[in-house]
Amino acid sequence: VSTMWKMLLNDDGLINRVIEFFGGEGQKWLSDPDTALLAVCAASVWQGFGFETVIFLAALQGIPRERYEAAAVDGAGPWRTFRAVTLPALRPALLFVYVVGIIGAFQVYDQIYVMTRGGPVDSTMTVVYYLVEKFHRLDLGHASAAAYLLVVFLAIASAIQMRIERRAS
């Protein structure tokens, strides 16, 4: 996936060619510090979109039809049905996708390695990329500290998200 996005976002890639075809000016998506992280994020979101779609589809199919029928009998319109029936039933799936997404976002490595190698000017450097680079350079102290902090941060973020979910339900 990352190789495909690297080719699409290259200076002479398809996206710049389409922009130039319509009279615009191509961007240096992967070599400009202002746009490199955005390009990596777009590739990561696109890569995870199918997984999240399947989770939401399964959650939607798990909502009993009787709830929608009861809402219709009570005179609820589409917006009210969504807020009162669909959204509460999707809450566990939303939490799951959110937690997995946050954890995945902090563990992005392959997209950055393939697309930018942490550059330009370290603009796409993430904790995991930093950790792996330090490990490869045998700077094990910094690598271990980064790994420990990553685990602690992800545990705290997950605990906060779970607590928010418990309060909401």
What role is predicted for each listed range?
Residues 1-169:
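A structural signal for multi-pass alpha-helical bundles of membrane permease subunits
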